[in-house]
């Protein structure tokens, strides 16, 4: 599972850990805001300390992202479609990473999309964060995800994290 430091991944990773099955939690920064990365790493450490079935670490994807960026010769001041296409590349690079580690460890990739964002308005990247094997909170509204976060006693920093797609260099 990819851990972003947000409430959706916080809830899903905690629920996965509670199953007792092997869980691999990955933080995958790509030009990430420092507070997002630190929340994600703190949550992974929390899971590893509380659940013996959890392993986790950070996979820095900045270098492969920059290589793609330079290969495609993206112009930041040009076409909006080009910017969006490359923003979605972040999600696809993370998906590739999750499936790599999933396959070498014999694990499924678990999604963090909720009912409204992923399955209501389609706020996900095709073949990116939408490309998963299981989606435990796919039927939950965001309000229900927040209720679960409270019930699971997740840290305030995760419960209060500003939702972001993690695809841009700024919070949005």
Question: What are the language-model segments listed below?
Answer:
Residues 1-123:
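ATP-dependent adenylation/nucleotidyltransferase module used to activate substrates
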């Amino acid at each position: 599972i990819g851990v972003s430091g947000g409430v959706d991944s916080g809830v899903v990773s905690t629920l996965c850990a509670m199953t007792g099955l092997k869980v691999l939690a990955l933080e995958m920064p790509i030009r990430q805001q420092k507070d997002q990365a630190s929340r994600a790493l703190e949550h992974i450490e929390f899971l590893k300390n509380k659940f013996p079935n959890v392993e986790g670490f950070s996979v820095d994807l900045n270098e492969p992202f920059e290589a793609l960026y330079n290969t495609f010769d993206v112009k930041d001041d040009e076409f909006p479609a080009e910017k969006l296409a490359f923003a979605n590349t972040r999600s696809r690079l993370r998906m590739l990473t999750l499936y790599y580690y999933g396959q070498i460890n014999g694990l499924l990739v678990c999604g963090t999309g909720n009912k409204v964002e992923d399955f209501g308005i389609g706020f996900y990247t095709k073949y990116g964060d939408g490309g998963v094997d299981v989606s435990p909170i796919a039927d939950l509204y965001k309000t229900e995800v927040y209720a679960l976060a409270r019930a699971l006693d997740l840290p305030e920093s995760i419960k209060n994290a500003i939702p972001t797609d993690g695809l841009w260099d700024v919070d949005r």
